[in-house]
Amino acid sequence: MAELNAPAPAPPRRGRALAWVLLGVVAFLVLLVVAAPAGGVARILEAAGAPARLALPSGRLWSGSAQLYLEGRDLGRLQWDLAPGSLLDGQLGADLVLEAPGHRFRGRAGVGTDGRLQLTGVEGEVREASLDELLRPYAIEPSGTVTFRDGSATVQGQRVLDAHADARWSGGPVSYALGGQLWRQRFPPLDATLRARDGQPVLVVRDPAGEELLDVALDAAGWAQLRVRYRFVALAGFPWPENPAPDTVVVELAEQLY
């Protein structure tokens, strides 16, 4: 009796064709991202309702730059380079550089599927020009430079979930108006740390001996709470009617930042 051999199966042409189609679609999307103008980033921020705004974009969506504004304030020129490797961690990440005449920062930003913004590896410096602009509304004229290192933060919406950074001010002469008089004092270099405490970012400033001078806490409602210890008042050379212990909190202020 003759054996009947079943015909060989046809090659999976349909599956191969589908794979080529998908590969073509992916290549087309990658080409769109690479070739898209940098203005697309500004439109994405606007659609997301972010408080930041980009103007005068140049370059491409993949690698470009634009002028960064936050709450209407010009923060300088922002440069970005998308980091495709961050997609393996479930994030859309980019290496960033922010530069202005009075400051320069660099680091990496990533947005996860949960909408959280993560900043890592932040370092930079704030020079006298930006320090003066920042403190002028409080009748303070500083000098010197503040350097930052080991900076990181996690932000969701307008809430700061976690924050970490170390900073150092080079010190120098400072003029300030208080009690209807103008005071001048030379300060030594001061160190500061930014840490999360009870779910709130807290900035602590210390003297060269490591003793606390003041601290600022930012709560979930956008209020910054400032506490000044007598040790700082004495360091500033301001006469105080009493002579309390150095750790005594003598000034408490609150200001809503957002």
Question: Over which residues does each language-model region extend?
Answer:
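Hydrophobic membrane-insertion alpha-helices, especially the h-region
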Residues: 7-37
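Non-cytosolic head/periplasmic domains of membrane-anchored proteins
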Residues: 105-189
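Extracytoplasmic/luminal low-complexity segments enriched in Pro/Gly and acidic/polar residues
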Residues: 199-258
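Short, hydrophobic/proline-enriched secondary-structure or compact coil segments at domain edges
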Residues: 94-96, 116-124, 165-167, 202-205, ...
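N-terminal beta-strand/beta-hairpin edge segment
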Residues: 52-139, 151
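Beta-propeller and related beta-repeat scaffolds in trafficking/envelope systems
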Residues: 78-87, 160-201, 239-257
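N-terminal intrinsically disordered, acidic low-complexity segments at the extreme N-terminus
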Residues: 1-4
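Aromatic-capped interface at the extracytoplasmic side
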Residues: 28-55
